Protein backbone atom coordinates (compact mmCIF):
# COMPACT_ATOMS: atom_id res chain seq x y z
CA UNK A 1 0.00 0.00 0.00
CA UNK A 2 2.86 2.36 0.84
CA UNK A 3 4.52 1.67 -2.52
CA UNK A 4 1.27 2.38 -4.37
CA UNK A 5 0.89 5.67 -2.48
CA UNK A 6 4.46 6.68 -3.30
CA UNK A 7 3.92 5.90 -6.97
CA UNK A 8 0.70 7.92 -6.98
CA UNK A 9 2.42 10.83 -5.29
CA UNK A 10 5.29 10.70 -7.75
CA UNK A 11 2.86 10.62 -10.66
CA UNK A 12 0.94 13.59 -9.23
CA UNK A 13 4.15 15.57 -8.88
CA UNK A 14 5.17 14.69 -12.42
CA UNK A 15 1.80 15.78 -13.80
CA UNK A 16 1.91 19.01 -11.80
CA UNK A 17 5.39 19.72 -13.09
CA UNK A 18 4.33 19.03 -16.65
CA UNK A 19 1.31 21.31 -16.33
CA UNK A 20 3.44 24.05 -14.81
CA UNK A 21 5.94 23.65 -17.60
CA UNK A 22 3.23 23.83 -20.22
CA UNK A 23 1.76 26.90 -18.54
CA UNK A 24 5.09 28.69 -18.64
CA UNK A 25 5.68 27.57 -22.22
CA UNK A 26 2.34 28.71 -23.52
CA UNK A 27 2.34 31.94 -21.52
CA UNK A 28 5.81 33.05 -22.60
CA UNK A 29 6.59 31.33 -25.88
CA UNK A 30 3.43 30.44 -27.72
CA UNK A 31 1.16 33.47 -27.30
CA UNK A 32 1.42 35.77 -30.33
CA UNK A 33 1.57 39.54 -30.08
CA UNK A 34 -1.86 41.05 -29.52
CA UNK A 35 -3.21 37.46 -29.36
CA UNK A 36 -3.30 37.24 -33.16
CA UNK A 37 -0.81 35.25 -35.24
CA UNK A 38 1.24 36.98 -37.90
CA UNK A 39 0.73 40.57 -36.74
CA UNK A 40 2.98 42.99 -38.63
CA UNK A 41 5.10 45.61 -36.92
CA UNK A 42 3.17 48.88 -36.96
CA UNK A 43 4.67 51.64 -39.08
CA UNK A 44 3.51 55.27 -39.21
CA UNK A 45 1.32 56.04 -42.25
CA UNK A 46 2.96 58.14 -44.96
CA UNK A 47 -0.08 59.06 -47.08
CA UNK A 48 -0.67 62.40 -45.34
CA UNK A 49 -4.19 61.52 -44.24
CA UNK A 50 -5.50 61.38 -40.68
CA UNK A 51 -5.54 57.89 -39.18
CA UNK A 52 -7.34 57.05 -35.93
CA UNK A 53 -6.29 54.11 -33.79
CA UNK A 54 -7.57 52.41 -30.68
CA UNK A 55 -4.32 51.33 -29.01
CA UNK A 56 -4.38 48.50 -26.48
CA UNK A 57 -1.33 47.89 -24.29
CA UNK A 58 -0.85 44.15 -23.80
CA UNK A 59 2.20 42.24 -22.56
CA UNK A 60 4.65 44.99 -23.45
CA UNK A 61 3.22 45.64 -26.90
CA UNK A 62 1.00 48.37 -28.30
CA UNK A 63 -1.74 46.87 -30.49
CA UNK A 64 -3.07 49.26 -33.14
CA UNK A 65 -6.72 48.85 -34.20
CA UNK A 66 -7.90 51.06 -37.06
CA UNK A 67 -11.13 52.81 -36.05
CA UNK A 68 -12.02 53.60 -39.65
CA UNK A 69 -11.49 50.06 -40.95
CA UNK A 70 -13.95 48.13 -38.80
CA UNK A 71 -11.55 47.95 -35.83
CA UNK A 72 -9.03 45.94 -37.84
CA UNK A 73 -5.72 45.08 -36.13
CA UNK A 74 -3.14 46.73 -38.40
CA UNK A 75 0.06 46.27 -36.43
CA UNK A 76 1.89 46.01 -33.13
CA UNK A 77 4.84 47.86 -31.66
CA UNK A 78 6.97 47.00 -28.60
CA UNK A 79 6.62 49.75 -26.02
CA UNK A 80 10.38 49.56 -25.54
CA UNK A 81 10.69 50.99 -29.06
CA UNK A 82 7.98 53.61 -28.63
CA UNK A 83 8.82 55.97 -25.79
CA UNK A 84 6.60 58.60 -27.41
CA UNK A 85 3.68 56.25 -26.76
CA UNK A 86 4.77 54.83 -23.41
CA UNK A 87 4.77 58.27 -21.75
CA UNK A 88 1.11 58.74 -22.72
CA UNK A 89 -0.08 55.41 -21.34
CA UNK A 90 -2.70 56.05 -18.61
CA UNK A 91 -1.99 54.96 -15.06
CA UNK A 92 -4.28 52.82 -12.92
CA UNK A 93 -6.43 54.52 -10.29
CA UNK A 94 -8.88 53.41 -7.61
CA UNK A 95 -10.83 56.66 -7.85
CA UNK A 96 -11.84 57.61 -11.38
CA UNK A 97 -12.88 61.14 -12.27
CA UNK A 98 -14.09 62.91 -15.38
CA UNK A 99 -14.74 66.64 -15.60
CA UNK A 100 -17.71 68.20 -17.36
CA UNK A 101 -16.66 71.82 -17.78
CA UNK A 102 -19.83 72.68 -19.71
CA UNK A 103 -21.97 71.96 -16.65
CA UNK A 104 -19.40 72.72 -13.96
CA UNK A 105 -19.37 69.26 -12.41
CA UNK A 106 -16.98 66.41 -11.72
CA UNK A 107 -18.12 62.78 -11.86
CA UNK A 108 -16.36 60.38 -9.56
CA UNK A 109 -16.43 56.74 -8.60
CA UNK A 110 -14.74 55.34 -5.52
CA UNK A 111 -14.23 52.20 -3.49
CA UNK A 112 -17.35 50.73 -1.92
CA UNK A 113 -19.78 52.58 -4.21
CA UNK A 114 -21.79 50.82 -6.91
CA UNK A 115 -22.68 54.07 -8.59
CA UNK A 116 -21.27 57.50 -9.37
CA UNK A 117 -20.97 60.80 -7.50
CA UNK A 118 -21.44 64.26 -8.99
CA UNK A 119 -19.44 67.09 -7.39
CA UNK A 120 -19.43 70.83 -7.92
CA UNK A 121 -16.35 71.57 -10.03
CA UNK A 122 -15.42 74.72 -8.12
CA UNK A 123 -16.24 73.87 -4.50
CA UNK A 124 -15.97 70.05 -4.74
CA UNK A 125 -19.24 69.89 -2.80
CA UNK A 126 -21.20 66.70 -3.38
CA UNK A 127 -24.29 67.30 -5.49
CA UNK A 128 -25.70 63.83 -6.18
CA UNK A 129 -24.98 60.15 -5.64
CA UNK A 130 -26.50 58.06 -8.42
CA UNK A 131 -26.83 54.32 -7.85
CA UNK A 132 -27.75 51.63 -10.36
CA UNK A 133 -31.37 50.78 -9.64
CA UNK A 134 -32.06 47.06 -9.90
CA UNK A 135 -28.40 46.04 -9.66
CA UNK A 136 -26.53 44.72 -6.63
CA UNK A 137 -22.96 43.96 -5.65
CA UNK A 138 -21.32 41.78 -3.02
CA UNK A 139 -18.22 43.68 -1.83
CA UNK A 140 -16.49 40.39 -1.01
CA UNK A 141 -16.36 39.52 -4.69
CA UNK A 142 -15.43 41.39 -7.81
CA UNK A 143 -13.46 44.59 -8.32
CA UNK A 144 -13.47 47.52 -5.91
CA UNK A 145 -14.29 50.20 -6.91
CA UNK A 146 -17.05 48.30 -8.72
CA UNK A 147 -17.82 51.18 -11.10
CA UNK A 148 -14.36 51.01 -12.65
CA UNK A 149 -14.93 53.05 -15.78
CA UNK A 150 -16.26 56.55 -16.47
CA UNK A 151 -16.43 58.27 -19.83
CA UNK A 152 -18.17 61.44 -21.02
CA UNK A 153 -19.32 61.52 -24.62
CA UNK A 154 -17.39 64.25 -26.46
CA UNK A 155 -20.32 65.14 -28.72
CA UNK A 156 -23.39 64.93 -26.44
CA UNK A 157 -24.30 65.25 -22.74
CA UNK A 158 -23.99 61.55 -21.91
CA UNK A 159 -22.08 59.83 -19.13
CA UNK A 160 -21.20 56.16 -19.56
CA UNK A 161 -20.44 54.22 -16.37
CA UNK A 162 -19.06 50.69 -16.21
CA UNK A 163 -20.71 48.40 -13.66
CA UNK A 164 -17.98 45.75 -13.54
CA UNK A 165 -19.61 43.22 -11.14
CA UNK A 166 -22.70 43.02 -13.34
CA UNK A 167 -20.85 43.40 -16.68
CA UNK A 168 -23.18 46.23 -17.69
CA UNK A 169 -22.68 49.79 -18.92
CA UNK A 170 -25.15 52.35 -17.55
CA UNK A 171 -25.77 55.39 -19.75
CA UNK A 172 -27.02 58.67 -18.26
CA UNK A 173 -28.26 61.98 -19.65
CA UNK A 174 -26.36 64.71 -17.78
CA UNK A 175 -27.73 67.70 -19.68
CA UNK A 176 -29.64 69.08 -16.66
CA UNK A 177 -26.73 69.19 -14.24
CA UNK A 178 -26.06 70.81 -11.85
CA UNK A 179 -29.75 71.60 -11.40
CA UNK A 180 -30.94 67.99 -11.64
CA UNK A 181 -29.28 64.59 -11.18
CA UNK A 182 -28.18 62.31 -14.03
CA UNK A 183 -31.13 60.69 -15.82
CA UNK A 184 -30.82 57.03 -16.71
CA UNK A 185 -31.13 56.33 -20.43
CA UNK A 186 -30.16 52.72 -21.07
CA UNK A 187 -28.21 49.71 -19.80
CA UNK A 188 -25.96 47.82 -22.22
CA UNK A 189 -25.08 44.23 -21.35
CA UNK A 190 -21.51 43.30 -22.32
CA UNK A 191 -20.81 40.26 -24.50
CA UNK A 192 -18.17 38.92 -22.09
CA UNK A 193 -18.19 39.11 -18.30
CA UNK A 194 -15.60 41.20 -16.49
CA UNK A 195 -14.28 38.37 -14.35
CA UNK A 196 -11.28 36.10 -14.08
CA UNK A 197 -7.77 37.21 -14.99
CA UNK A 198 -6.11 38.80 -17.98
CA UNK A 199 -3.74 36.56 -19.95
CA UNK A 200 -0.92 37.16 -20.67
CA UNK A 201 -0.28 39.22 -17.56
CA UNK A 202 2.56 39.65 -15.07
CA UNK A 203 0.92 41.49 -12.15
CA UNK A 204 -2.45 42.95 -11.05
CA UNK A 205 -4.14 40.55 -13.45
CA UNK A 206 -7.72 40.52 -12.16
CA UNK A 207 -10.19 42.02 -14.63
CA UNK A 208 -11.71 45.28 -13.36
CA UNK A 209 -12.52 47.11 -16.60
CA UNK A 210 -12.10 50.54 -18.19
CA UNK A 211 -14.03 52.78 -20.59
CA UNK A 212 -12.91 55.02 -23.44
CA UNK A 213 -14.88 57.11 -25.93
CA UNK A 214 -13.29 57.70 -29.29
CA UNK A 215 -12.50 61.39 -29.75
CA UNK A 216 -15.23 61.77 -32.38
CA UNK A 217 -17.80 60.09 -30.14
CA UNK A 218 -18.58 57.22 -32.51
CA UNK A 219 -17.38 54.34 -30.35
CA UNK A 220 -16.92 53.27 -26.75
CA UNK A 221 -14.19 50.73 -25.96
CA UNK A 222 -14.56 48.47 -22.91
CA UNK A 223 -11.35 47.26 -21.30
CA UNK A 224 -11.28 43.71 -19.88
CA UNK A 225 -14.40 42.83 -21.90
CA UNK A 226 -13.13 43.73 -25.37
CA UNK A 227 -16.40 45.14 -26.64
CA UNK A 228 -16.62 48.03 -29.09
CA UNK A 229 -19.99 49.81 -28.88
CA UNK A 230 -21.54 52.01 -31.55
CA UNK A 231 -22.75 55.01 -29.53
CA UNK A 232 -25.51 55.86 -32.01
CA UNK A 233 -27.21 52.45 -31.93
CA UNK A 234 -25.74 51.42 -28.56
CA UNK A 235 -25.00 48.02 -30.04
CA UNK A 236 -21.79 46.00 -29.82
CA UNK A 237 -20.12 46.03 -33.24
CA UNK A 238 -16.86 44.21 -32.47
CA UNK A 239 -14.92 42.42 -29.77
CA UNK A 240 -11.13 42.81 -29.58
CA UNK A 241 -9.41 39.90 -27.86
CA UNK A 242 -6.45 42.05 -26.86
CA UNK A 243 -8.84 44.45 -25.13
CA UNK A 244 -10.54 41.50 -23.45
CA UNK A 245 -7.19 40.88 -21.74
CA UNK A 246 -6.18 44.45 -20.98
CA UNK A 247 -7.72 47.55 -19.45
CA UNK A 248 -4.93 49.88 -20.58
CA UNK A 249 -6.05 51.73 -23.70
CA UNK A 250 -5.84 55.10 -25.41
CA UNK A 251 -6.56 56.71 -28.75
CA UNK A 252 -3.69 57.69 -31.03
CA UNK A 253 -4.36 59.80 -34.11
CA UNK A 254 -1.67 60.12 -36.75
CA UNK A 255 -2.00 63.61 -38.22
CA UNK A 256 0.46 65.27 -40.59
CA UNK A 257 3.19 62.79 -39.81
CA UNK A 258 2.88 63.18 -36.04
CA UNK A 259 1.09 61.43 -33.20
CA UNK A 260 -1.77 63.20 -31.45
CA UNK A 261 -3.44 62.00 -28.27
CA UNK A 262 -7.02 63.33 -28.13
CA UNK A 263 -8.48 63.30 -24.67
CA UNK A 264 -5.11 63.06 -22.94
CA UNK A 265 -3.85 65.91 -20.76
Give residue ranges: language-model regions.
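N-terminal Sec-pathway targeting helices
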Residues: 1-18
